[in-house]
Amino acid sequence: MQLFQDLINRAKQFNQAPTCPEQLHAQQGRYKIIHQALKIPNLPAPLHYLNFYSLIGQPRAPIFEQSHLNITQALDVATVLVSTSMHSVGHFHAYDIQQQFEYQDSLFNFDGREILSAHLPHVRFTRNDDELSLDLNIKTLDSGRCFYQLPWSLGQFWSLSCQCLGQLHYAGQTYPIEQRGVLEYARSINFAYLPF
């Protein structure tokens, strides 16, 4: 009976892992869907916040469908969203993993536009775009860590408090960034039973 109670009450599973992932990786082994995010709140006006969100390998859900890429496998798509409170036209991009995405030794390269280099506790995130570019050095902190694991290791989620330092360029203006944020990393198996 205790087994079923533990499956229902998952609160015991929080923070039951290493303090941070040893290495961020792309699709590997049974983990086919990889999520990375950087969230920096409380930036001065007109920025207010900065969000970076990537999903490498798509779950089989219509909301993630990228038919314009002409890809038959949802797992071969990577999507990236970078936004601030300022109006931005090019904040969302989808990439063909086979042709526009490269992963090598903790370096995630999304067609040269967004590049994430992670050698924890140090991370560097750059974005080269005509409208919104940035260069950030990120250091994860020992405080403010959270880990959650789905039953049977179907998925894992890390959230790490971090200090961000760098610059953001938008519409000819340069904005310095020196702020705390949150770095997230998650991985899961491909839940192939989701309706398409």
Please provide the spans of the model-predicted regions:
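Structured soluble/peripheral alpha/beta segments that form catalytic or ligand/cofactor-binding pockets
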Residues: 1-196
